[in-house]
C-alpha cells in the first residue's frame, strides 16, 4: 500500500482532489472530518475549547464553528491554543483510521491533511501531493463559495505556512489555478502514474 499525503492551503481544492481519489479507489483519511468528529457534543475536546475560548458553544451544546474560527485565527497565540487542544486527538483518531485503511485491502491510502507539513507529519506518508493555487484566487474562492469575509480569508491563509514552503515539500504539485475539469485531469494523470 502506498500512502499519499494530500495537502494544500485553505481554498486550494483539496476536497475536490480527495473526492476524485476516493472515486478512483483510494482509502481516504480526512483530517478535517476527524477534526469535526472530535468536537462533537460529549467529546473532551469540546469542553476544553469551551474553557479556552469564550462563547463558542451554541445553546444546544454544539460547537459554534464560526465563532471559534473568528477567535482562534485572530492571533498566532490563539491558533496555537486551538491546535494544542485538537491536534493530539486528531493524531490518535487518524492512527486508528490508518490501521483501518491498511486492513481494508486498498492499494492507496490518502491522508487528506491541510497541516501535513506544518505539523511535521510528512514522515507518515510515502508521497506528498500538494494542491496549489495563488493566494488571491484562494481568497476569492473562500469569499464566494464558503461565505467568509475577505479579512477572515486572509487571516486564515496567513495562519498557514507560506506557499513556497509547501511547494518545496511536494513530491507532486497539482495546479488548481484553472478549471475543475483541468484539476481532475491532473488527478487522473497522477493516479495513472502510481
Curated annotation (Swiss-Prot):
Please state the Enzyme Commission number of this protein: 2.7.1.24
Pfam (any one): CoaE
Q: Which PROSITE patterns match?
A: DPCK (PS51219)
Catalytic reactions of this protein? 3'-dephospho-CoA + ATP = ADP + CoA + H(+)
Which pathway does UniProt place it in? Cofactor biosynthesis; coenzyme A biosynthesis; CoA from (R)-pantothenate: step 5/5
Q: Which residues form the DPCK domain?
A: 3-194
Where it mainly occurs, coarsely classed, is cytoplasm
Gene Ontology cellular component terms for the protein in this record:
cytoplasm
Q: Which UniProt keywords apply?
A: ATP-binding, Coenzyme A biosynthesis, Cytoplasm, Kinase, Nucleotide-binding, Transferase
Binding annotation for ATP: 11-16
Q: Which GO terms describe its molecular function?
A: ATP binding; dephospho-CoA kinase activity
Q: Which residues form a coiled coil?
A: none
Give compartment(s). Answer: Cytoplasm
Q: What class of enzyme is it?
A: transferase
Q: Name one GO biological process term.
A: coenzyme A biosynthetic process
Q: What PANTHER family does this protein's entry cite?
A: BIFUNCTIONAL COENZYME A SYNTHASE-RELATED (PTHR10695:SF46), DEPHOSPHO-COA KINASE-RELATED (PTHR10695)
Stated role: Catalyzes the phosphorylation of the 3'-hydroxyl group of dephosphocoenzyme A to form coenzyme A.
Family (UniProt): Belongs to the CoaE family.
According to UniProt, the name of this protein is Dephospho-CoA kinase
Q: Which gene encodes it?
A: coaE
Amino acid at each position: 500500500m502506498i500512502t499519499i499525503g494530500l495537502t494544500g492551503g485553505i481554498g486550494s481544492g483539496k476536497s475536490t482532489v480527495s473526492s476524485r481519489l476516493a472515486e478512483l479507489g483510494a482509502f481516504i483519511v480526512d483530517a478535517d472530518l476527524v477534526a469535526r468528529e472530535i468536537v462533537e457534543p460529549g467529546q473532551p475536546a469540546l469542553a476544553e475549547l469551551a474553557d479556552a475560548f469564550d462563547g463558542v458553544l451554541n445553546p444546544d451544546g454544539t460547537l459554534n464553528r464560526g465563532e471559534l474560527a473568528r477567535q482562534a485565527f485572530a492571533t498566532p497565540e490563539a491558533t496555537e491554543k486551538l491546535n494544542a487542544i485538537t491536534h493530539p486527538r486528531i493524531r490518535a483518531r487518524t492512527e486508528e483510521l490508518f490501521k483501518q485503511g491498511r486492513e481494508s485491502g486498498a492499494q492507496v491510502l490518502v491522508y487528506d491533511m491541510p497541516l501535513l507539513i506544518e505539523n511535521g507529519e510528512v514522515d507518515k506518508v510515502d508521497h506528498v501531493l500538494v494542491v496549489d493555487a495563488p493566494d488571491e484566487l484562494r481568497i476569492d474562492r473562500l469569499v464566494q463559495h464558503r461565505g467568509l469575509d475577505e479579512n477572515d480569508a486572509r487571516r486564515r491563509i496567513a495562519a498557514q505556512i507560506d506557499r513556497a514552503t509547501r511547494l518545496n515539500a511536494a513530491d507532486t504539485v497539482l495546479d488548481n489555478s484553472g478549471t475543475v475539469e483541468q484539476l481532475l485531469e491532473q488527478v487522473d494523470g497522477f493516479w495513472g502514474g502510481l
